Amino acid sequence: MSTEPSEPAGPLAGIRVVALEQSVAGPLASRVLADMGADVVKVEPAQGDFARHWDSYVHGDSSHFVWLNRRKRSVVLGLREPADRAALDRLLAGADVLLFNMAAAAAERAGLTRERLRGEYPSLVVCQVTGYGSTGDARDRKAYDMLLQAETGILGLTGDDRGPVRLGVSLCDIGTGLYAATLILGALFERSRTGEGRFIDLSMFEAMTEFTGPNLTAFANAGVRYGRNRLRHHSIVPYGIFACNDGFLAIAIEHDAEWRVFCERVLDRPDAGADPELSTKRAAAGAPAWTRPGSPMA
């Protein structure tokens, strides 16, 4: 992390972001803004962002922290100290965006309430990221990627009959961070027309419902309950991982035109591509059979 802001460039040049952030979701959101040219001031506690201590793979620094915090400046503030609270207020007086990801009760103790921020900084765009929302019984629960994958139904769609498989990336953290950045950009655009800021209350739980949207919609409208489908798609075929002689092959065919090209150029089976029955019912037809170990396709 640099001690001075980089040369202004990009669509957000001139925008200052104050980010009270730890872990992944908040830091990723502010890093997206920094990549667009915003001047991001990262506020950390004395012990530093949690992610600083996750590993030491980048010249002694954490790979997660390096990935999430490029192009930012950093300052240490203890928000329980009156002098540091006053320093934060001075930062906010010159800021365009405030981003913070912490439990709702912790935010309230730090004075980061909707009422105060909207009253004292009416043009400030504020984005609060929590695990489960700022109200309700779950508002102060800690949110971890694994738990959210389970609670939002994502793990009900992975794996097979032997059980669920956690996604190999931190989907909930990353997805929420990107969602937060998008909402902040929208609020900045709105402010450019109205002069008014906005308070964005985003939970990781609700952000993850976007990833299960088709499943929720199918169930709500037709009672269809998608289950675990290993590496296949519920509606599109062939779309998955197929076994070959020397390993596995990823195939994704979305529509009939691609199916015809695939049959002609890859399978050397133009007749299959021209077969109307296979064209509409290709899932149950021959794709898995054509990719058995020892087949010509392998």
Short names for language-model regions:
Residues G48-F50, A220-Y226:
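Short Pro/Gly-enriched beta-strand edge/turn motifs at strand-loop
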Residues G177-G197, E210-A222, C263-P270, A274:
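Oxidoreductase and adenylate-handling cofactor-binding alpha/beta cores
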Residues S170-L185, M204-T212, E254, E258:
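Mid-domain beta-loop-alpha active-site segment that forms a flexible
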Residues S134, D161-V169, S192-M208, G227-H234, ...:
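Conserved Rossmann-fold dehydrogenase catalytic segment
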Residues G78, F100, D201-F205, I251-I253:
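Active-site-adjacent beta-strand anchor residues
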Residues S6, H64, R198, V237-P238:
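Residue-level marker for the onset of beta-strands and adjacent loop->beta junctions
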Residues V237-A298:
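Aromatic-enriched alpha-helical interface/lid elements that frame and gate functional surfaces
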Residues M1-R193:
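N-terminal helix-loop segment corresponding to the beta1-alpha1 unit
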